[in-house]
A protein has these predicted regions:
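Flexible phosphate-sensing "switch/lid" loops adjacent to ATP/NTP-binding sites
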Residues: 1-320, 327, 344-347, 370-371, ...
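Catalytic nucleophile serine of serine hydrolases
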Residues: 332
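Extracellular/periplasmic helix-exit of transmembrane alpha-helices
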Residues: 339-347, 351
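Conserved P-loop NTPase catalytic core
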Residues: 348-375
Length: 495
């Protein structure tokens, strides 16, 4: 088999739409009968996934793999940085934790990871027809270029043609694209095969004079003006938009606590699709109100975020509502917070030895350590309101939690998972709503508590909904992007 062709998507800045454009290209190539795979040498994200091999990777490449119809593979994201503070991150290489590093230390040493990057890429290139590569931030960060392993530095390593994307929705797209091109070296500019304007609203004819001038000044073709597509596909860069209070006019109200180090917000995305369940994020006690359900999400720093809950008044508000019977569900770090104590005597979670009082809503005790559990799991929910719901989920957490009382679920071998006490539920299972079984059971229970008839709520299975959204994305991008030019840039004929 010949080595895979490739196309790389770089952006003028973070949030330009690289991730979704890569997902669209993965879908388009798959629709065209090609074996496409995504690749991002280094991703910085709080949202991660566990592969079937028990290895950790960024969710952006998981989404792109799903769009391509292939199994997520850690080779698609050999380096993952998970911020744990304003100046440091957990460094994960080939799915395994290498340790904590300050930003300055990582910057000095990251070139040593090039062999890991190239081994992952070369291995994928032997199996795939096309590799869709995503850059990070901007290739024109002139203070970082000398150590670049994710933008033009990577493009040179793998000899990738590049599409440069700018976001017109924020304004200034012509300056973004022109300025980025001007700050690149001549050999880097030569790699750019086309400019793409993303998130356009309105009549493209109005843009024509600007496009012509941009092409004249950069000597590069504009190969697409992609409209602002209303698709519901998880995207790390759109988290800030998702965190804005969503809710809507639905009869049921679910409030997610907006923790400072919130991670894996994707756990709750399936709930947003339920026709009766409004989902919103809250950052203070005033916003909390009186919801039908309170959700405590995962976090990259359980200890600091628990202290934040205390300081901002959300702990007091949550405890009052829980005492009145409001259901509370904690996932991963949120589950740990719900317990009696959190023992970080080694300082592995917060960076300083301490033991904290938990929220006291579950009979559990958590002891943190350096060891991280990573696994894909199957389980059956045993908690009374949702008993029988079958889950396919994954675990990523440090710390061991000892629980008394009833479990939330059981593994196939009979082992217990999570904890339940009255109206409070805790679990380590990420992706617990993806199959739809628990979503249906949870919404049905909440409806019965409120006297609402849930029978008219037709819920599309998450897998089918995701497929529809990928196809919608691909259709929109295919119609707007010159795919002949994209195939030509890769040295391929259009399929």
């Amino acid at each position: 088999m010949s080595r895979a062709k490739c196309i790389m998507v770089q952006g003028t800045m973070s949030g330009a739409g690289k991730s979704l454009l890569c997902a669209a290209l993965c879908r388009i190539f798959a629709q065209d009968g090609l074996h496409a795979v995504p690749f991002k040498s280094q991703n910085m994200a709080l949202n991660s996934f566990v592969t079937k091999d028990g290895l950790e990777m960024g969710r952006a490449q998981v989404v792109q793999a799903q769009a391509a119809g292939v199994e997520p593979d850690v080779r698609m994201n050999p380096i993952l940085l998970k911020p744990s503070s304003d100046v440091g991150s957990q460094v994960i290489v080939n799915g395994e934790v290498r340790g904590q590093m300050a930003a300055a230390e990582y910057f000095r040493t990251k070139k040593k990871l090039v062999p890991d990057i190239m081994a992952a890429y070369d291995s994928l290139a032997e199996e795939a027809d096309v590799i869709v590569i995503e850059g990070a931030g901007s290739p024109a960060e002139i203070n970082l270029k000398s150590e670049d392993i994710v933008n033009m530095g990577l493009a040179e390593m793998v000899d990738a043609p590049v599409l440069l994307v700018g976001d017109i929705d924020r304004g200034g797209v012509f300056a973004q694209l022109y300025g980025t091109v001007e700050l690149l070296e001549e050999k880097e500019r030569a790699r750019i095969k086309g400019l793409v304007i993303n998130k356009f609203r309105g009549d493209v004819e109005i843009l024509r004079p600007g496009l012509a001038m941009l092409e004249e000044k950069t000597h590069l073709p504009v190969v697409g003006v992609v409209p602002y597509l209303k698709v519901d596909i998880e995207d790390e860069d759109s988290l800030s938009q998702r965190l804005e209070s969503r809710g809507g006019k639905k009869p049921l109200d679910a409030a997610i606590l907006r923790l400072p180090h919130l991670s894996n917000f994707t756990d709750f995305m399936p709930l947003e699709q339920h026709p009766l369940l409004g989902v919103r994020y809250v950052a203070n006690a005033h916003e909390l109100g009186t919801p039908d359900l309170i959700l405590l999400p995962g976090t990259k720093n359980t200890v600091d975020d628990l202290l934040w809950l205390r300081q901002c008044g959300l702990e007091t508000a949550l405890l009052k509502l829980a005492a009145k019977g409001t259901p509370v569900l904690g996932v991963c770090g949120g589950y740990q917070m719900l317990g009696q104590t959190l023992d970080d005597s080694e300082g592995s979670e917060s960076g300083r030895p301490q033991t904290l009082r938990g929220l006291g809503l579950l009979p559990t005790r958590t002891v943190f350590s350096q060891h991280k559990r990573r696994a894909q799991v199957r389980a059956v929910v045993t908690a009374a309101p949702f008993a029988g719901a079958e889950l396919e989920a994954y675990e990523i957490h440090t710390g061991v939690t000892e629980a008394e009382g009833e479990p939330f679920a059981r593994y196939p071998d009979g082992g217990r998972e999570g904890c339940v006490q009255g109206n409070v539920f805790g679990t380590y299972l990420h992706g617990l709503f993806d199959t739809g079984a628990l979503t249906e059971a949870l919404a049905g229970w909440l409806c019965r508590r409120r006297g609402i008839d849930p029978s008219d709520a037709a819920l599309i299975p998450m897998e089918e909904y995701r497929r529809q959204q990928f196809d919608k994305l691909a259709d929109g991008v295919r119609a707007a992007l010159d795919m002949d030019a994209v195939y030509a840039a890769m040295g391929m004929e259009k399929h």
